Amino acid sequence: RGLGDVYKRQGLYDSRMGYSPFQRGAPPERETQMEETILTAQNLKFRYDSDQPVYALDGVSTEVKRGEFVAVLGANGCGKSTLAKHFNAILLPESGKVYVEGMDTADDDKIYDIRQTVGMVFQNPDNQIVATVVEEDVAFALENLGVPPEEMRRRVDDSMKMAGIYEYRERAPHNLSGGQKQRVAIAGVVAMRPDCLILDEATAMLDPRGREQVMQTIHYLNRNMGITVVSITHYMEEAAQADRVLVMSKGHVVMEGTPKEVFSQTEKVRSLHLDVPQAAELRDELVKAGIPMPEGIIDTGECAQALYELLQ
């Protein structure tokens, strides 16, 4: 069946949605937008097994501003994915609080609104794709919500264009590359018009080209659409492009700051069993070799510029 058949089905608009979908307009200036907090964790504690003494999250307190791009780093088992799942109430705190736009995730009456506000994209796109045609998959959740057919058509088309998959709209997802599939999953979430997008290792299974395509899409959504992004990742080059970086270890946030503030502490980052961006590593090696290099280099452009100036 085609998407046209989906749109012809009668659906009732769910008045609880309480928004006019896709009428977002131009995003506010980032400085103004990022004054407002959208996600808050207060002394958050969580265990997967209440009979065990080890906490996956042990007193985590942090917040994310509206419009911000936050990267969360940490070794395997540090709690970063567990934290992500608390931000849209997939998991609930054992103690402490998590708020999404002021809504308590422990409030059953707010779960619907919280999951409208915060969308998630997971590591394996095949686990989120449910339809046999790309545009049908992007429309799937909207159909379930009873979004009017004309609005559904507009939102599906706009989301596919933003994710760079409009040309694949009539293709079968299983014939797409990993990066293209992940962008289908992103389009499906974006069509719901979330204010915040959580990426849980969303590029981990992709090749370098696929990672680049997905991250270009994510940065477009953040910069041009004003969507808040929290990216759980182990790719340092991705984290270096964020507004802010959180580093977790054993259920705690142990480092926090801008990418320059965090990655300039190369020895501390390595002590947490993490890599640093290649440019930062090269800068350290050049300094060890007696070549003066400025502090805070975290990308190849900065490194190349510093070397160019030294050679003048």
Describe each PLM feature range.
Residues L73-A75:
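The feature captures the beta-strand-to-loop junction immediately N-terminal to the Walker
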